[in-house]
Curated annotation (Swiss-Prot):
Identification of the protein by name: SsrA-binding protein
GO biological process: trans-translation
Matching CDD domains: SmpB (cd09294)
Main localization, broad class: cytoplasm
Pfam families, alphabetized: SmpB
Domain of life: Bacteria
Subcellular localization: Cytoplasm
Organism: Maridesulfovibrio salexigens (strain ATCC 14822 / DSM 2638 / NCIMB 8403 / VKM B-1763) (Desulfovibrio salexigens)
The entry's keywords: Cytoplasm, RNA-binding
InterPro entries documented for this protein: SmpB, SsrA-bd_prot, SsrA-bd_prot_CS
Length: 155
């Protein structure tokens, strides 16, 4: 019998600013508690990561600052676009993240939303902030790598 190919999870949205502004130390996968109209909006890709971050309250992790646009074809039951959404993580993962954020001055940022086996998952990253100088160095390093790759391809 032939083996089935594993499909890579299809991305809904990426947080491009996070890769530019933060250096990732560790990444995790978390589930989200969503309402039906939020899922339908996410299937259409109507989400914005602009000011998203993870907040810890009473032993729970919450996704704050993510805008999921209202679903057009919903009736009278519409979700609130900017409400905080609970993350589904194990208690030990939450404790570990919370302690590292408090001790080392790191932050937890959302990286991407994607479908995994019919469920919507959020990739979060424990990250260290970059300053402007580090960002410029990173851009220079990428430009140099791109130029050398281009020259090697032409050689």
């Amino acid at each position: 019998m032939a083996k089935k190919k594993k499909k890579s999870p299809s991305s809904i949205a990426l947080n491009k600013q996070a890769r530019r502004n933060y250096e990732f130390v560790e990444t995790l996968e978390a589930g989200l508690v969503l309402k039906g109209t939020e899922v339908k909006s996410l299937r259409q890709g109507l989400v914005s990561f602009m000011d998203g971050y993870i907040n810890f309250k009473e032993g729970e992790a919450w996704l704050v600052g993510i805008h999921i646009a209202p679903y057009d074809h919903a009736g009278y039951t519409q979700h609130e676009p900017d409400r905080p959404r609970k993350l589904l993580l194990h208690a030990r993962e939450i404790e570990k993240l919370q302690s590292r954020v408090e001790q080392k001055g790191l932050t937890v940022v959302p990286v991407r939303l994607y479908f995994s086996r019919g469920k919507i998952k959020l990739e979060i990253a424990l990250a260290k902030g970059r300053n402007v100088h580090n960002r410029k160095e990173e851009l220079k390093r990428r430009d140099i790598a791109r130029d050398t790759a281009r020259q090697l391809a032409n050689y």
